[in-house]
Amino acid sequence: MIDIHKNIYDNKLFEELKIDCKKCFGLCCVALYFSASDGFPIDKESGKPCINLQPDFKCSVHNSLMKRGFKGCTAYDCFGSGQKVAQVTYKGIDWMQSPELTNQMSEVFLIMRQLHEMLWYLKEASVLNISDTIKSKIDLIIEETEKITNMGPEQIINLDIISHRTKVNLLLSQASESVMGKVKSFIKTSTLKNMKKLSKNIDLIGADLR
């Protein structure tokens, strides 16, 4: 058996990437767009608060989202970007207190969500059974990405997110190839060993192997 994880899988790696709605300002309920054509019961524009969002940033129909047709809401994962934007980027200043920040905050949230998703996959890759060279590169880009998430709103908005994602995807591909190479090698070696064991006990002379 080959273990694809080289390092101990530490859940603490992902603590900051887990949803904590209590520390958020209902940003997913504001920033995201959805429509009836996508299976939702109503249309909602990006940057406009959902009609179900309450003044305390809680959902008034949270316990009946599925029944009311808001299935997408129950499946959405912001990877902890909501509380990051609320508590770190804007230091607790919400869009209800400062309506002029609503559009900017929504834009920052959508970018932050992408960055946090990248961090999730990078941290997943960092514990895989990969080469030390790739592991070092992944650790460096994790550090770089975390620094970006701590930047101010304007810097985050001006970030070349496509360029950064390209760098991340390249490393994730390298990590995947590294793991798959070891898995294929293990399977090949195991198969050969099993074939040798079988050959000692089976006489295939004259057998029809078509």
Residue ranges of predicted features:
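N-terminal, Lys/Arg-enriched amphipathic/low-complexity engagement segments
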Residues: 1-26, 36
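Terminal amphipathic alpha-helical/low-complexity segments used for targeting or macromolecular assembly
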Residues: 69-191
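Tandem repeat scaffolds
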Residues: 184-210
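Membrane-interface helix-loop junction between the first two transmembrane segments
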Residues: 37-44
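Local cysteine-cluster metal-coordination motifs and their immediate loop/turn environment
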Residues: 18-35, 48-80, 106-113, 120
